[in-house]
Design a protein with these regions (language model features):
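Short, solvent-exposed cationic patches
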Residues: 164-176
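Radical SAM enzyme [4Fe-4S]-AdoMet core and its adjacent flexible, acidic
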Residues: 6-141, 149-150, 154, 159, ...
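Short amphipathic alpha-helix with an adjacent loop that forms part of the alpha/beta core around
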Residues: 2-4
Length: 176
């Protein structure tokens, strides 16, 4: 972390799928949650922007997710990117994904618990409304362009195996 300088253009997005037990089970390694928490605290202490990336799976009570959101806000992260775990064929475990009705109900229950709280999400209100089942959208390459070491991530990459484009122009032109 000492190799970087805080900037409004640099955000550390830390993967945390819920509370200690749930996250460590999700990544199949005990102790990862505590390491993530210490990294988050260190980065915030040094003045960096920090967000959390959280995926929700089956059998997660909204109350537990609400406690996680409270904890994330207490840590001082800028926001949480939250989404349901979408089913995809190559996943090593197939029985953990939320069905459409389960996903809608979980997010409706969660948002109800969040009324009056100061939870900060790293997504638009349109997307959050979609999670609660109040909107439908199609996948688009411009909806949430993401670039990582593999290239430009195509939308619905998990659902249809689209993968990545090597350039932004390729992402826009090749995505159907």
């Amino acid at each position: 972390i000492d190799e970087y300088t805080p900037s409004p253009y640099l955000t550390f997005s830390i993967h945390l799928d819920g509370n200690k037990e749930r996250h460590d089970a999700s990544v199949c390694l005990e102790g990862v949650f505590e390491k993530c928490i210490s990294v988050i605290k260190l980065a915030i202490e040094k003045g960096f922007r920090v967000t959390i990336n959280c995926t929700l799976f089956q059998n997660e009570p909204a109350e537990e997710v609400a406690e996680f959101m409270d904890m994330a806000m207490e840590l001082g992260v800028e926001a949480v990117t939250i989404s349901p775990g979408y089913h995809y064929e190559r996943a090593p475990k197939q029985d953990v994904f939320l069905k459409k009705t389960e996903s809608k109900q979980l997010f409706r229950d969660l948002f109800k618990l969040g009324i009056g709280k100061k939870w900060r999400f790293n997504q638009s209100s349109l997307y959050l409304d979609f999670l609660a089942g109040n909107q439908t959208y199609e996948c688009t390459p411009w909806g949430n362009p993401t670039r990582n070491v593999f290239g430009w991530q195509k939308p619905c990459y998990l659902l249809v195996g689209e993968g990545y484009a090597s350039t932004f122009a390729g992402l826009m032109e090749e995505t159907e």
